[in-house]
From Swiss-Prot:
Phosphothreonine modification, residue list: T157
PTM (free text): The N-terminus is blocked.
Protein name: Kappa-casein
Main function: Kappa-casein stabilizes micelle formation, preventing casein precipitation in milk.
Signal peptide positions on this chain: 1-20
Similarity field: Belongs to the kappa-casein family.
Keywords, sorted A to Z: Disulfide bond, Glycoprotein, Milk protein, Phosphoprotein, Secreted, Signal
Record GO biological process: lactation; protein stabilization
Gene encoding the protein: CSN3
Top-rank taxon, per record: Eukaryota
Positions of the record's site feature: Cleavage: F117, I118
């Protein structure tokens, strides 16, 4: 868009000069001497890059002018890219990364939602308000305490331990079986 406006401005500034030259070529040479009236004199050639500086309404350009260069040209310094730093020759060369134009925000910003986007459930209208009844006069029932048997802590000696093993073996009892007599 900038280049288009620049071309239009250049044409607007140069067309009057070109039109004067074309009109001068069409007029027959009726003057014996080469003198022309003041309004018909051709202007000297002025390079285009001097013209905008002579007019005050152009002013200073606040935006940086960049020449048109091929994007994939590796010899052009890129101001918005991080140049890869290679410390060791066997290290992988990182890809160029985009850097942000400004510092990242330190605080996570919460989106401000418009009230129409906030979902508020509609209130339910109840016909009857149910109040739970609480019995304030409650009978206290005693809780039975579990019967516990007293436990005896005893120190086991190796002799007593071996005796307890011997005595804990099941004894075999012999019962005399007599055949029934009829």
């Amino acid at each position: 868009m900038k280049s288009f406006l620049l071309v239009v401005n250049a044409l607007a500034l140069t067309l009057p000069f070109l039109a004067v030259e074309v009109q001068n070529q069409k007029q027959p040479a009726c003057h014996e001497n080469d003198e022309r009236p003041f309004y018909q004199k051709t202007a000297p050639y002025v390079p285009m890059y001097y013209v905008p500086n002579s007019y005050p309404y152009y002013g200073t350009n606040l935006y940086q002018r960049r020449p048109a260069i091929a994007i994939n040209n590796p010899y052009v310094p890129r101001t918005y890219y991080a140049n890869p730093a290679v410390v060791r020759p066997h290290a992988q060369i990182p890809q160029r990364q985009y850097l942000p134009n400004s510092h990242p925000p330190t605080v996570v910003r919460r989106p401000n939602l418009h009230p129409s986007f906030i979902a508020i459930p509609p209130k339910k209208i109840q016909d009857k308000i149910i109040i739970p009844t609480i019995n304030t006069i409650a009978t206290v029932e005693p809780t039975p305490a579990p019967a516990t048997e007293p436990t005896v802590d005893s120190v086991v000696t190796p002799e007593a331990f071996s005796e307890s093993i011997i005595t804990s073996t099941p004894e075999t009892t012999t019962v005399a079986v007599t055949p029934p007599t009829a």
